[in-house]
Amino acid sequence: MPMQEPQRRLLGPFNSTRTGAPHLELSANQTGPWCLHVSIPDGLFLSLGLVSLVENVLVVISIAKNQNLHSPMYYFICCLALSDLLVSVSIVLETTLILVLEAGALATRVTVVQQLDNVIDVLICASMVSSLCFLGAIAVDRYISIFYALRYHSIVTLPRARWAIVAIWVASISSSTLFVAYYNHTAVLLCLVTFFLATLALMVVLYVHMLARAHQHAQAIAQLHKRQHLVHQGFRLKGAATLTILLGIFFLCWGPFFLYLTLIVLCPKHPTCGCFFKNLNLFLALIIFNSIVDPLIYAFRSQELRMTLKEVLLCSW
């Protein structure tokens, strides 16, 4: 677990302080006086992680409690919340260990710390890969519901959804283990960045197609003035809007980190890139922020889930 600022935290395999990783610590005269470095306190990381942990636990409990939410769409949303939960647990665990080690309250071997760091790295990487996969799965689910509405329930069945979920988790954990084991290979970074861009491209294409179809239907419905169809189409538009918001926030929160990985390969010692590298902790804080925002979007966009969340909160009191 790297212990030096500014890049001492998560995803140690991509951290400049790890042995064998690209040397990214540039001095002030290499980056220039114009270089902006945003420092993120440990307390902020711990607070963000705890907030995200509580929110995503509530989402998982709400979906598990309400039988009306036991559908493929909400199963994928639940797994997305579990991915965010992995981020939260990892953040809280690592920040706590850092504080304990820095305070000298825990004396342990370097090899033990390294093993703990590897476990945290696998958790974070698995959550990253699984988040992308489940966002893609949600987009595909919505696409089928709009363009193959009559066949939707025969195409997207619960058994198929469960098998897809199992496959995604197995693939995410397996690939993350390999990524951490071979962290000092440039191919690892390129694979992660390529997977991120490919998944985003797929989702953008699906969303653009869905929004185009929704716009055509809205125009036709406006001419017919049939309220029943309008309500049904409004439901679909609401779902597409929710997923678009999720995708946009995911891109804004994860984009800087993937740009960071890309620049490690392209310009590891360039002054401008070095300035960007100094803000790794900021990019990681954005990732945690993404895991906080996701449950809020579910609660405000889904009336059924919002009502269940209220019931869960009232029961907890």
Swiss-Prot record:
Show the stretches that span the lipid bilayer. 38-63, 73-93, 119-140, 164-183, 192-211, 241-266, 280-300
Please name the GO terms that the record assigns under molecular function.
Answer: melanocyte-stimulating hormone receptor activity
One GO cellular component, as annotated: plasma membrane
**Can you locate the S-palmitoyl cysteine lipid attachment residues?**
315
Keywords, alphabetical? Cell membrane, G-protein coupled receptor, Glycoprotein, Lipoprotein, Membrane, Palmitate, Receptor, Transducer, Transmembrane, Transmembrane helix
Glycosylation (residues): 15, 29
Q: Where in the cell is it found?
A: Cell membrane
Among InterPro entries, the record links this protein to: GPCR_Rhodpsn, GPCR_Rhodpsn_7TM, Melcrt_ACTH_rcpt, MSH_rcpt
Q: How does it sit in the membrane?
A: Multi-pass membrane protein
| A Pfam family | 7tm_1
Identify the main location.
Answer: membrane
Q: Which residues lie on this side of the membrane: Extracellular?
A: 1-37, 94-118, 184-191, 267-279
- Give residue ranges on the Cytoplasmic side: 64-72, 141-163, 212-240, 301-317
The UniProt similarity line reads:
Belongs to the G-protein coupled receptor 1 family.
What this protein is reported to do is described as:
Receptor for MSH (alpha, beta and gamma) and ACTH. The activity of this receptor is mediated by G proteins which activate adenylate cyclase. Mediates melanogenesis, the production of eumelanin (black/brown) and phaeomelanin (red/yellow), via regulation of cAMP signaling in melanocytes.
Assembly and interaction partners: Interacts with MGRN1, but does not undergo MGRN1-mediated ubiquitination; this interaction competes with GNAS-binding and thus inhibits agonist-induced cAMP production. Interacts with OPN3; the interaction results in a decrease in MC1R-mediated cAMP signaling and ultimately a decrease in melanin production in melanocytes.
Q: What is this protein called?
A: Melanocyte-stimulating hormone receptor
What gene name is listed for this protein? MC1R
